Amino acid sequence: METSLVLPIIDISSPDKISSSTAKLIRKACLEHGFFYVKNHGISEELMEEVLRESKSFFNLPLDEKMSLLRRDLLGYTPLHAEKLDPSLTSSTGDSKESFYFGSLEGALAQRYPNQWPPEGEVISWDVETYGASAHSDYGMVTLLLTDGVPGLQVCRDKSRQPRVWEDVPGIRGAFIVNIGDMMERWTNGLFRSTLHRVMPVGKERYSVVFFLDPNPDCHVECLESCCSETSPPRFPPILAGDYIKERFRLTYES
Protein backbone atom coordinates (compact mmCIF):
# COMPACT_ATOMS: atom_id res chain seq x y z
CA MET A 1 0.00 0.00 0.00
CA GLU A 2 1.40 3.39 -0.99
CA THR A 3 0.25 6.94 -0.21
CA SER A 4 1.82 10.40 -0.24
CA LEU A 5 3.36 11.76 2.96
CA VAL A 6 3.44 15.41 3.96
CA LEU A 7 6.62 15.98 5.98
CA PRO A 8 7.40 18.98 8.21
CA ILE A 9 9.40 21.78 6.52
CA ILE A 10 11.91 23.38 8.91
CA ASP A 11 13.18 26.87 8.07
CA ILE A 12 16.70 27.52 9.42
CA SER A 13 17.34 30.85 7.72
CA SER A 14 19.01 32.09 10.95
CA PRO A 15 20.98 29.03 12.16
CA ASP A 16 22.80 31.03 14.85
CA LYS A 17 19.47 32.12 16.31
CA ILE A 18 17.34 28.99 16.07
CA SER A 19 14.34 29.66 18.26
CA SER A 20 12.92 27.28 20.81
CA SER A 21 9.89 26.87 18.55
CA THR A 22 12.13 25.71 15.68
CA ALA A 23 13.94 23.29 17.99
CA LYS A 24 10.57 21.94 19.11
CA LEU A 25 9.54 21.43 15.47
CA ILE A 26 12.74 19.45 14.79
CA ARG A 27 12.21 17.34 17.92
CA LYS A 28 8.58 16.69 16.97
CA ALA A 29 9.65 15.59 13.47
CA CYS A 30 12.28 13.22 14.92
CA LEU A 31 9.71 11.73 17.30
CA GLU A 32 6.88 11.31 14.81
CA HIS A 33 8.46 10.76 11.40
CA GLY A 34 12.23 10.46 11.60
CA PHE A 35 12.15 12.52 8.37
CA PHE A 36 11.76 16.23 7.62
CA TYR A 37 12.77 18.91 5.10
CA VAL A 38 15.24 21.72 5.80
CA LYS A 39 15.03 24.92 3.74
CA ASN A 40 16.90 28.24 3.76
CA HIS A 41 20.01 26.37 4.90
CA GLY A 42 22.47 28.76 3.28
CA ILE A 43 23.64 26.49 0.44
CA SER A 44 22.83 28.02 -2.93
CA GLU A 45 20.66 26.18 -5.45
CA GLU A 46 23.43 26.78 -8.01
CA LEU A 47 25.91 24.79 -5.90
CA MET A 48 23.36 22.04 -5.28
CA GLU A 49 22.70 21.73 -9.02
CA GLU A 50 26.44 21.74 -9.77
CA VAL A 51 27.00 18.87 -7.33
CA LEU A 52 24.25 16.85 -9.03
CA ARG A 53 25.81 17.56 -12.46
CA GLU A 54 29.20 16.33 -11.25
CA SER A 55 27.56 13.21 -9.83
CA LYS A 56 25.91 12.48 -13.17
CA SER A 57 29.21 13.06 -14.99
CA PHE A 58 30.97 10.51 -12.81
CA PHE A 59 28.35 7.79 -13.13
CA ASN A 60 28.26 8.28 -16.91
CA LEU A 61 31.95 7.30 -17.13
CA PRO A 62 32.79 3.91 -18.72
CA LEU A 63 32.53 1.04 -16.26
CA ASP A 64 36.24 0.17 -16.43
CA GLU A 65 37.15 3.71 -15.36
CA LYS A 66 34.75 3.56 -12.43
CA MET A 67 36.01 0.10 -11.45
CA SER A 68 39.53 1.52 -11.16
CA LEU A 69 38.16 3.34 -8.10
CA LEU A 70 36.54 0.24 -6.60
CA ARG A 71 35.69 0.56 -2.91
CA ARG A 72 38.52 0.16 -0.37
CA ASP A 73 37.91 0.50 3.38
CA LEU A 74 34.29 1.46 2.61
CA LEU A 75 35.31 4.38 0.36
CA GLY A 76 35.21 4.49 -3.42
CA TYR A 77 33.00 3.10 -6.18
CA THR A 78 30.31 0.46 -5.58
CA PRO A 79 28.99 -1.08 -8.82
CA LEU A 80 25.45 -2.02 -9.75
CA HIS A 81 23.91 -4.81 -7.64
CA ALA A 82 26.88 -4.89 -5.20
CA GLU A 83 24.79 -3.67 -2.27
CA LYS A 84 21.67 -5.20 -0.76
CA LEU A 85 20.38 -2.81 1.87
CA ASP A 86 17.62 -5.22 2.89
CA PRO A 87 19.38 -8.52 3.76
CA SER A 88 16.00 -10.23 4.21
CA LEU A 89 15.26 -10.15 0.47
CA THR A 90 15.43 -13.66 -0.99
CA SER A 91 16.66 -12.51 -4.40
CA SER A 92 20.36 -13.10 -5.02
CA THR A 93 20.53 -9.84 -6.98
CA GLY A 94 21.52 -6.71 -5.10
CA ASP A 95 19.98 -3.26 -5.35
CA SER A 96 19.78 -1.59 -8.75
CA LYS A 97 22.03 1.33 -7.88
CA GLU A 98 25.61 2.54 -8.09
CA SER A 99 27.34 4.49 -5.34
CA PHE A 100 30.50 6.47 -4.80
CA TYR A 101 31.50 7.02 -1.17
CA PHE A 102 34.01 9.54 0.09
CA GLY A 103 34.74 10.84 3.55
CA SER A 104 36.60 13.56 5.40
CA LEU A 105 39.11 15.60 3.40
CA GLU A 106 41.38 16.46 6.32
CA GLY A 107 42.38 15.37 9.79
CA ALA A 108 42.91 11.93 11.30
CA LEU A 109 39.96 10.32 9.52
CA ALA A 110 41.26 11.40 6.12
CA GLN A 111 44.60 9.71 6.90
CA ARG A 112 42.97 6.57 8.28
CA TYR A 113 40.44 6.24 5.44
CA PRO A 114 41.93 7.90 2.33
CA ASN A 115 39.52 8.90 -0.40
CA GLN A 116 39.75 7.68 -3.97
CA TRP A 117 39.32 10.21 -6.77
CA PRO A 118 39.16 10.00 -10.57
CA PRO A 119 41.90 11.88 -12.45
CA GLU A 120 41.31 15.63 -12.38
CA GLY A 121 39.17 16.79 -15.30
CA GLU A 122 37.91 13.29 -16.16
CA VAL A 123 34.52 13.58 -14.60
CA ILE A 124 32.68 15.25 -17.19
CA SER A 125 12.39 -0.82 -18.56
CA TRP A 126 12.07 -1.85 -14.89
CA ASP A 127 10.92 -5.07 -13.23
CA VAL A 128 8.37 -4.49 -10.46
CA GLU A 129 10.60 -6.33 -7.96
CA THR A 130 13.68 -4.26 -8.75
CA TYR A 131 14.67 -1.71 -6.11
CA GLY A 132 16.78 1.39 -6.61
CA ALA A 133 17.52 0.92 -2.91
CA SER A 134 15.74 -1.81 -0.99
CA ALA A 135 14.02 -1.18 2.34
CA HIS A 136 16.49 -0.07 4.99
CA SER A 137 17.24 2.42 7.72
CA ASP A 138 20.45 4.45 7.65
CA TYR A 139 23.36 3.32 9.81
CA GLY A 140 24.61 6.54 11.35
CA MET A 141 23.31 9.63 13.16
CA VAL A 142 21.77 12.02 10.65
CA THR A 143 21.42 11.92 6.85
CA LEU A 144 21.03 14.91 4.53
CA LEU A 145 19.70 14.04 1.07
CA LEU A 146 19.79 16.12 -2.11
CA THR A 147 17.81 14.71 -5.04
CA ASP A 148 17.47 15.70 -8.68
CA GLY A 149 13.68 15.88 -8.43
CA VAL A 150 13.02 12.42 -9.86
CA PRO A 151 10.55 10.66 -7.53
CA GLY A 152 11.00 7.21 -6.02
CA LEU A 153 11.80 7.78 -2.33
CA GLN A 154 9.27 6.16 -0.01
CA VAL A 155 9.13 5.81 3.77
CA CYS A 156 7.39 3.33 6.06
CA ARG A 157 6.67 4.95 9.42
CA ASP A 158 5.58 1.73 11.13
CA LYS A 159 8.06 -1.04 10.28
CA SER A 160 6.19 -3.58 12.43
CA ARG A 161 2.90 -3.18 10.58
CA GLN A 162 1.92 -5.78 7.98
CA PRO A 163 1.37 -5.19 5.18
CA ARG A 164 3.75 -2.26 5.26
CA VAL A 165 2.37 1.13 4.29
CA TRP A 166 4.74 3.01 1.98
CA GLU A 167 4.37 6.76 1.52
CA ASP A 168 5.97 8.81 -1.26
CA VAL A 169 8.34 11.62 -0.25
CA PRO A 170 8.65 14.19 -3.06
CA GLY A 171 11.66 16.44 -3.34
CA ILE A 172 11.34 20.17 -2.70
CA ARG A 173 13.51 22.44 -4.82
CA GLY A 174 16.25 24.06 -2.75
CA ALA A 175 15.54 21.93 0.33
CA PHE A 176 17.34 18.96 1.86
CA ILE A 177 15.52 15.87 3.06
CA VAL A 178 16.80 15.01 6.54
CA ASN A 179 16.35 11.69 8.31
CA ILE A 180 17.43 10.10 11.57
CA GLY A 181 19.75 7.06 11.46
CA ASP A 182 20.00 3.94 13.60
CA MET A 183 22.85 5.28 15.73
CA MET A 184 20.79 8.28 16.77
CA GLU A 185 17.93 5.91 17.58
CA ARG A 186 20.32 3.92 19.81
CA TRP A 187 21.60 7.06 21.51
CA THR A 188 18.07 8.26 22.28
CA ASN A 189 16.94 4.78 23.41
CA GLY A 190 14.42 4.61 20.57
CA LEU A 191 12.96 8.06 21.28
CA PHE A 192 14.01 9.47 17.90
CA ARG A 193 12.90 7.29 15.01
CA SER A 194 15.18 5.75 12.40
CA THR A 195 12.53 5.25 9.75
CA LEU A 196 12.50 2.48 7.17
CA HIS A 197 12.77 3.81 3.61
CA ARG A 198 13.44 2.64 0.06
CA VAL A 199 13.79 3.91 -3.50
CA MET A 200 11.50 2.48 -6.17
CA PRO A 201 12.30 2.71 -9.90
CA VAL A 202 10.12 5.05 -11.93
CA GLY A 203 11.41 4.26 -15.41
CA LYS A 204 14.16 6.90 -15.53
CA GLU A 205 17.56 7.51 -13.99
CA ARG A 206 17.61 9.10 -10.54
CA TYR A 207 20.60 10.90 -9.05
CA SER A 208 21.06 11.87 -5.41
CA VAL A 209 23.86 13.20 -3.24
CA VAL A 210 23.88 12.14 0.40
CA PHE A 211 25.76 13.44 3.45
CA PHE A 212 26.02 10.96 6.34
CA LEU A 213 26.89 12.49 9.72
CA ASP A 214 28.53 9.83 11.88
CA PRO A 215 30.56 9.90 15.12
CA ASN A 216 34.30 9.23 15.14
CA PRO A 217 35.06 5.47 15.01
CA ASP A 218 36.29 5.43 18.63
CA CYS A 219 33.15 7.14 19.95
CA HIS A 220 31.40 5.13 22.69
CA VAL A 221 27.69 4.99 21.83
CA GLU A 222 25.29 4.16 24.64
CA CYS A 223 21.74 5.19 25.53
CA LEU A 224 21.62 8.70 26.99
CA GLU A 225 20.55 8.86 30.63
CA SER A 226 18.02 11.57 29.78
CA CYS A 227 16.30 9.13 27.42
CA CYS A 228 16.05 6.28 29.95
CA SER A 229 13.90 5.71 33.02
CA GLU A 230 12.60 2.94 35.27
CA THR A 231 9.79 2.30 32.81
CA SER A 232 12.05 2.74 29.78
CA PRO A 233 15.41 1.09 30.56
CA PRO A 234 18.25 1.07 27.98
CA ARG A 235 17.23 -1.00 24.94
CA PHE A 236 20.66 -1.13 23.28
CA PRO A 237 24.05 -2.23 24.66
CA PRO A 238 27.03 0.16 24.43
CA ILE A 239 29.15 -0.14 21.28
CA LEU A 240 31.96 1.69 19.50
CA ALA A 241 30.65 3.68 16.54
CA GLY A 242 33.29 2.26 14.19
CA ASP A 243 32.49 -1.35 15.11
CA TYR A 244 28.79 -0.74 14.58
CA ILE A 245 29.23 0.88 11.15
CA LYS A 246 31.61 -1.86 9.95
CA GLU A 247 29.18 -4.60 10.96
CA ARG A 248 26.32 -2.90 9.13
CA PHE A 249 28.42 -2.57 5.98
CA ARG A 250 29.45 -6.22 6.26
CA LEU A 251 25.80 -7.30 6.27
CA THR A 252 25.06 -5.03 3.30
CA TYR A 253 27.78 -6.49 1.09
CA GLU A 254 27.67 -10.13 2.21
CA SER A 255 23.91 -10.66 1.99
Regions flagged by a language model, labelled:
Residues 1-255:
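Peripheral, non-catalytic segments flanking oxidoreductase cores
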